[in-house]
Amino acid sequence: MDRAADHGVDALIAADPGVLGYASQRHPQLTLHLSVQGSATNASALAFYAQHYNIRRAVLPRVLSLAQVRQVAANSTVPIEVFAFGSLCIMAEGRCHLSSYITGESPNLCGVCSPAKAVRWSEDAEGLSARLSEVLIDRYSADEPAGYPTLCKGRFLVGGKRFHALEEPTSLDTLDLLPELAAMGVEAVKIEGRQRSPAYVEQVTQVWRAALDAHRLAPERFAVKDQWRQVLAGLSEGSQTTLGAYHRSWQ
């Protein structure tokens, strides 16, 4: 953090109160963003972080609906950032213990749910197997799209039936929600790039840059292009996308 400040970075993102406290006291000139791992889901929580650590932006967890995001944005003095595309987490972010149960490493400390060193792929007559710390997470036939092995998206035998007990491999894609997110005052959108290749990041950011520019120039005429959908679909986990928690029919 000290080196980052010396190099003049634009902002630092953090969740640990100790880190935030050190940064705000030692480097008050630094712009601090609250990470999604802070798991702040309401205006009161954001006000706490702003008062004690002077955060300038907060990334909301992916478990909130559009109605909840709208409520937070309307009642918070802290600018809001939301996830727009990438891996989907169904857990209360910053509080998941599934990965550490299997790998022995905390996502909060090590930065990933499934460390690359714990992932192993193998192919045999039964298909393609994905393991995490030698625990079989899923097995795919030749015509099935394979997802990255995370425990919450594994396929397991439950009650004699093999299925995705928690969540299927899928990616969050909110291109269709861009006008609504802009209208409710969302300051920025976040593209999940952890454990992704430069090629993945390049293609996703190109699509989103084009979409954001198109919306800014003519918001009333904004429409998602088929070409954008095709690119993002090809980069999605399991070759499928979802609106995740943003879409809840009862809200």
Each model region followed by its residue ranges:
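Active-site pocket-lining/capping segments in soluble small-molecule metabolic enzymes
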Residues: 1-40, 59, 63, 67-188, ...
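Short, glycine/polar-rich helix-capping loops at beta-to-alpha or helix-loop-helix junctions
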Residues: 42-46
